[in-house]
Amino acid sequence: MIGIVIPIKRLHLAKSRLIDLLDPADRQQLVVTMVRHVITTARQAVSYLSIPARIWLVSPEPTLATDSEGIEWLPDNQEELNAALTEARQRIQAAGVQIMMVLAGDLPFVTVRDLILLSEALTDNDVVVAPDQHGQGTNALGLHLPSQLPFGFGPDSAGYHLRTAARLGLRASLISTPTLAFDLDDGERLQQYYRCIASCDNFAR
């Protein structure tokens, strides 16, 4: 079974890099919109994956899960992403999950095809890293369970995950698509996002 895990910060803390560009209410609404898009995409992808899958939201915000059918909530008791994901990994492995796919909750253009590519890449690899547009952060991470790979989300996390996988003797690879790599981390990207949603009836699938 595949476990798609979507970690989300407290809404008022999310997208802090945009604090000078958006007021708190607009920033929070932006985050909710992106989270809902990621959840919808993950739910649609489940029917296309080669093995059964479940979706978990790891967050101190339970309403995000209760508002979304088919989403299971894992409370984030750690208040630190890597610790929260480590705890989530233990819990979903106990539930029978064999493949864990961590998907950032703030990917506005992620598609079903992106998740299929991530799943397919795990056929021949123990670890698959999908970096952000700078090649530094990790927007998605796939791994087989059980796994000793420590989570290292943060600065240069893509490189960290690849180096650590190699040190542990794990087969690892990168995948990258424009929609999976797109990350709203500055004003230019924010304007690109607004231009796209203004010209599209729906996000790309």
Curated annotation (Swiss-Prot):
Pathway: Cofactor biosynthesis; coenzyme F420 biosynthesis. Its EC number is 2.7.7.105. It catalyses: phosphoenolpyruvate + GTP + H(+) = enolpyruvoyl-2-diphospho-5'-guanosine + diphosphate. Coiled coil: none annotated. Keywords: GTP-binding, Nucleotide-binding, Nucleotidyltransferase, Transferase. InterPro entries: CofC (IPR002835), Nucleotide-diphossugar_trans (IPR029044). The keyword Transferase applies. Phosphoenolpyruvate binds at T138, G154, S157. It is an enzyme of class 2 (transferase). GO terms for molecular function: GTP binding; phospholactate guanylyltransferase activity. One of its GO terms (biological process) is F420-0 metabolic process. Belongs to the CofC family. The exact nature of the substrate is currently not known. This entry has been annotated based on its similarity to Actinobacteria. PANTHER family: 2-PHOSPHO-L-LACTATE GUANYLYLTRANSFERASE. HAMAP family: CofC (MF_02114). Guanylyltransferase that catalyzes the activation of phosphoenolpyruvate (PEP) as enolpyruvoyl-2-diphospho-5'-guanosine, via the condensation of PEP with GTP. It is involved in the biosynthesis of coenzyme F420, a hydride carrier cofactor. This is Phosphoenolpyruvate guanylyltransferase. It comes from Chloroflexus aurantiacus (strain ATCC 29366 / DSM 635 / J-10-fl).
